[in-house]
């Protein structure tokens, strides 16, 4: 049993639970675990586990790129002539500065704690209150951050959760070459994904992953399952299709993976995941996961603060498909 739950062990959860108990136990637990909690918050989004991580992003940070071209020289000749051309370039991660503030009336908070303890006593809830309480907050931060990673569009005055930094689709729209942008017509998702696959340069095919929204992935499975000419593919790939919403595109070595951030966007994205960067702080005291009781307001309060941003190292490698009706 956890420290905060230990603190109220033996107290009748209905009659004896007091504000003073929670004022000390829960903030202490969160303070002790603050580093792990802020890390969990910024990496809860699904796509953060797929891409390269850049830490120390407290302001704009450059990703340094090196392009090398080697030309053979004539070894039978005397002399020394440079046959290597190298170009150094940069792409910049421009992070957004995000905070999540929450407050609870002390009576409502105590009622929630008491109800949770009753459920634990009855065996229907196993997690200690503080873990259950915090994990639910982290889960929802992750869900919103996942959408922002793909769909974000920075605004001078943010009004929604997508307004704090430019997401991957905004960057792709601006920087991916026109030749790599494909309009996908019809209603056959299998054919649409194959069209994107066919546009991937041959020298990049082994490292590229095709990302889709979950509804597009389900349509892919439908188009394999209910099409008589493809039903054998669905049978052979059945185990893959039902695990992590990812599968190898039949007849290829290329992974197709569903990510929540592309839901309802009608986009199919082929890219090299290691060339997509997710930037976070991770090193300074600007990152915060704090919980306390405000005596002045007579409220429990919480603050989570962090920076986050994304960038594509090489937009020319990306294939961006847009599904049209």
Positions of PLM-derived features:
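Alpha-helical scaffold segments that mediate packing/assembly in large oligomeric complexes
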Residues: 106, 113-195, 322-325
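Residues at beta-strand starts and edge strands
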Residues: 96-98, 131, 206, 296-300
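Active-site-proximal structural scaffolding
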Residues: 102, 130, 210-213, 295
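Ordered core of a single globular domain
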Residues: 190-228, 234-235
